Amino acid sequence: MPSAPTWPALITTLIEGRHLSVSESTWAMRQVMRGEATPAQLGGLLVALRASGETVDEIVGFRDAVLEEALPLDADPRALDIVGTGGDPYGAVLNISSVASVIAAAAGVPVIKHGNRGASSASGASDVLTALGVDLSITPERVAEVLRETGITYAHAALFHPGFRHAAATRRELGISTLFNVLGPLCNPARPEASAVGVADLSRVPLMVGVFRTRGATALVYRGDDGIDKLTTTGHSHIWEVSRGAVTEHDLDPLELGIPRAPIEALLGEGVEQNAEVIRRVLAGEPGPQRDVVLLNAAAGLEAFDLMGDPTRVQQPMARRLREKVAIAADAVDSGRAAAKLEEWAAATRA
């Protein structure tokens, strides 16, 4: 009978260039989520994993433990999550996924967004949504009710994964992208069946794709060639389309969609309040590079949701599919529905 895992044994395994099994990873993350791991043990684990490179089995084990310890979210899983890993080299990219989620909901897609406060970025989804008037202090039951009432809700990681608080200080002090950046998009407590996920670190794309593939989930996983965890407008992006256990790769040039190039500076935010103000202007219909990149990423979410219902869409060119979805997203903004959706959502969380 194998001996029970210990922290020295697991960290030694990683230092020696070997990897953890699913069960060892589950044990370690369970220790973290229950507050039974010391900061030194957690820091050692995170750095050793970062140095050795995480595997799909390790991420699956960590994810299983996080969801096992999560508070339940009683919601229809036929929904969409648009999310990014964070950890891009700029550390200050506009909260594109948050506003794209509002636009997708305004276009009629049920959205269950999952996120947290900034750890490896200046402004996390929770930070900017709070600035936009969304109350994150509501109960898990109310989170589900808000979805049924408005078509969009937010699963604040600190609420549904209270064990994450045990890792917050270590993550903040390390100041680097860690396995938690990969875990976040995989640990939505509602387990929505469609995901649009941006990954900043190219070496971690196979992890994200591999986990979605083993789950039989539907997802568009993407990365800008400029290193941001979004579909970018500064140049090309790469997309990994996951459907029914198969993966199809695409190269996307936004020029194919009629979207002009933008400098990276146009996609960067300056802080929580400034990002919130940019989002308000985008939802009000202001043209420019911020609008362009938001519509493109909203389109990815809309396409992921449609792919969930119709897997044969993989046979169509990605550029054509996204061009159609950009038009739908633009209409949701220009009609005023997206701005109204944000106000409706925020009001529901405060009711």
Curated annotation (Swiss-Prot):
Mg(2+) 1 binds at S97, K230. Gene3D superfamilies: Nucleoside phosphorylase/phosphoribosyltransferase catalytic domain, Transferase, Pyrimidine Nucleoside Phosphorylase, Chain C. Signal peptide: none annotated. InterPro entries: Anthranilate_Pribosyl_Tfrase, Glycosyl_Trfase_fam3, Glycosyl_Trfase_fam3_N_dom, Glycosyl_Trfase_fam3_N_dom_sf, Nuc_phospho_transferase. It holds the Pfam family Glycos_trans_3N. GO terms for cellular component: cytosol. Anthranilate 1 binds at G84, N116. It comes from the Bacteria. Its EC number is 2.4.2.18. It catalyses: N-(5-phospho-beta-D-ribosyl)anthranilate + diphosphate = 5-phospho-alpha-D-ribose 1-diphosphate + anthranilate. Mg(2+) 2 binds at D229, K230. Transmembrane segments: none annotated. Its cofactor is Mg(2+). Binds 2 magnesium ions per monomer. 5-phospho-alpha-D-ribose 1-diphosphate binds at residues 84, 87-88, 95-98, 113-121, 125. It is an enzyme of class 2 (transferase). Anthranilate 2 binds at R171. Coiled coil: none annotated. One of its GO terms (molecular function) is anthranilate phosphoribosyltransferase activity. Keywords: Amino-acid biosynthesis, Aromatic amino acid biosynthesis, Glycosyltransferase, Magnesium, Metal-binding, Transferase, Tryptophan biosynthesis. Pathway: Amino-acid biosynthesis; L-tryptophan biosynthesis; L-tryptophan from chorismate: step 2/5. Belongs to the anthranilate phosphoribosyltransferase family. Homodimer. Catalyzes the transfer of the phosphoribosyl group of 5-phosphorylribose-1-pyrophosphate (PRPP) to anthranilate to yield N-(5'-phosphoribosyl)-anthranilate (PRA). PANTHER family: ANTHRANILATE PHOSPHORIBOSYLTRANSFERASE (PTHR43285:SF2). This is Anthranilate phosphoribosyltransferase. It comes from Clavibacter michiganensis subsp. michiganensis (strain NCPPB 382). The gene is trpD.
